[in-house]
Amino acid sequence: AVTPGSIPNFPFRDCNTTNGAYRLAPVWRPSGSNTYCFKIQVSQDALSCTGACCSADLHKIEFNVCSSCLVAGASVDATVNGVRTRVGATLDKAPAGPVGSAVLRLTQLGLDTTTAQDAEVCLTLKTNRGGQGCTTLDQLCSSPGFPAGTCTAAMFDVACDCCPVSQAGQALPPPPPVIPPVLRPCDVCIAATIVPPANDVRPYRYDSATCAAIQQNIANAMNSLLGGANINVFSPFAPNASQCFDTQIITCGRFNGSDTDALANLTEAVQQQLSAFIGVASGGNVCNPKLEKYTVTVSTINNVADQCLDLSQSASCFLPGVPFPNCTCNTTQGVMPFTVSPTWYAQPANVRWGRNVTEYCFTVNTLQPSQVVPSTCYNANDALAKIEWYASDAFRSAVKGFTVYPAGGSNKTIADSWGATGTDTLKVNLNWNLLQANGGKVCVAIQNPFTMGDICKGALGQCYASIFNRDNSDYCCPIYRTGP
């Protein structure tokens, strides 16, 4: 039986939200009374998908919708390339989602990687006889952190293993007719979007300072590319705080696109720049631990009248697996109400460890009960028994021990402890309850000049940390990637 609230984030299913060939084009278009159309894009490159998800058919699309649209008698008609879907669109509650979550489901689509490319899906929203129900995408679509009218959709294969999530938003309104008709005004925005995983146990959201820095970086690059293409600029790309959202940052400019050759050169230059923009949007590296399991997308948004630049690129971090931890246990993030912060920091060491020693501190946080992923390995009130790091045996002598700081309690020092030689495992026993763990920290004392990044294995300059609730059969050991 499905447990209500067991999967708090869309698509409210246990599937891979970042791996798949199908996504919505960044912009939807209106088409007559209460009808809205979305274009499907197919991308089978390594940044979009791996393995079977790259070739799977598109069986079903589910949209994240507002439960207020689930009104008796209200309905949605769906077509693909002008033909009604084989099975009618249905509005339904999400059984595993939080209270109030709902989806619009289009199933048995029968599309593949060839027939889905540029296929157009149109939705006609109808009220009941009493005029109740949703008639606009502002009312229908639920996309927290995005501008109103943005729709979030998941594309499923038949087995519902692959479910890449993407967004489509409103096009910018046409500009007022103040520019002479001999010119071609191009109102273009660059949208940098982070798409959280379905199980978002370490949520990362853009703050105002990060947004301003990313907007400035993108603006500088776009203005330089416009100059290099010898294109006349009406309004340079520039930061705008009103275009900063939790999971999306938009940077806009306006230029003359009447010279088709110059516009073609600009298009090629911006296409080559998209990977750099993804790096900017992800803090320098898409494998930044803060964005573990996230997808980063950079795309253009144009005005309705003229699609001057139509570009998009997505990336996720796919690192090779590591032989850690050295046991058989449940490594799924979120199966315990404890997490390790994606960043560590350095501080002066406890005097016990002597001179020329630095401590590298990892903060522990806790989840709400509704965020914990159901499993057989965790029982209510299980303690945070220990933390293990994937660390090189070659640096055993450099690790002096631990200083641990339970929340609300006194700190204490603990001697270093390692697994058997060859397992490359550094560990510390804690036995913390939820109160002690929420904001508690564990600091590893390391002899200079070595650093935490030196002793950790797996990802260059980063660490894999695994947390445990016990050491006997059927236990939890979720793995979290961390960095400086």
Swiss-Prot record:
One of its GO terms (cellular component) is extracellular region. InterPro entries: Pherophorin. Glycans are attached at N16, N240, N256, N265, N326, N330, N356, N411. It holds the Pfam family DUF3707. Induction: By sexual inducer glycoprotein. It is found in: Secreted, Extracellular space, Extracellular matrix. The keyword Secreted applies. May be involved in conversion of asexual males and females to the sexual pathway. This is Perphorin-2.
